[in-house]
Regions:
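Short, positively charged, Gly/Tyr-enriched micro-motifs
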Residues: 64-126
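Basic, short loop/linker segments at the boundary and entry of helix-turn-helix/winged-helix-like folds
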Residues: 30, 35-73, 80-81
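Short acidic (Asp/Glu) and glycine-rich catalytic loops that position anionic groups and cofactors
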Residues: 19, 52-54, 115-116
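Solvent-exposed, flexible loop/coil residues
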Residues: 23, 50, 56-60, 70, ...
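Charged, often Cys/His-bearing segments associated with DNA-binding zinc-finger transcription factors
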Residues: 1-46
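Active-site- or DNA-interface-adjacent structural scaffold in DNA-acting proteins
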Residues: 106-168
């Protein structure tokens, strides 16, 4: 019998666009080749739902989570911008570039900053705690977002607080 004190079944991104879809209405405002445009075009490949299934209870157990494709894109942008959880939640709510990158609608209210803590903790406890840092590295390679900067540290050091592994 399956028991879970922290049960969430996996939530999935709805691929059908809403009337107020940020990419459809304002995607032209996001510079081509930017990390935002890259995430908008490739987030489903970078963060496939199957790659996060290990974080959740079996289907039908618990309430649905926020979609992994969206939350992984948010955590990636948070690292690249060096934002706090509150700043990240505000960017998701108010910044059109972020809405386009994560696949949100323009009127999407976002979520509480504690959702980021929850996701980081789930990822940190998983068998693949570096999946976000791996994605950050790929975004940096593909977009050159750090091009021209002297320091190019994109390793687990910058994610120490974000995705620290715990010892049992």
């Amino acid at each position: 019998m399956f028991e879970c004190n922290d049960c969430l079944m996996q939530g999935f991104e709805q691929m059908n666009r809403q009337l107020t879809d940020a990419e459809a209405l304002a995607g032209h405002l996001v510079p081509a080749g930017s990390m935002f445009a890259f995430l908008a075009a490739h987030r489903a490949e970078l963060f496939p739902d199957a790659g996060y299934a290990d974080l959740f209870a079996p289907p039908g157990v618990g309430r649905p989570s926020l979609p992994a494709t969206r939350m992984a894109a948010v955590l990636t942008l948070q690292v690249l911008h060096d934002y706090s959880d509150r700043e990240t939640a505000e960017a998701v709510r108010f910044d059109v570039r972020w809405k386009v990158a994560i696949g949100a609608s323009l009127d999407d209210p976002g979520y509480d900053p504690s959702s980021l803590v929850y996701w980081r903790n789930r990822i940190a406890r998983s068998e693949r705690p570096h999946r976000i840092s791996d994605a950050v590295s790929k975004v940096v390679r593909e977009t050159g977002v750090l091009k021209g900067r002297r320091r190019r540290a994109v390793d687990s050091t910058i994610l120490a607080d974000a995705v620290a592994t715990r010892t049992p």
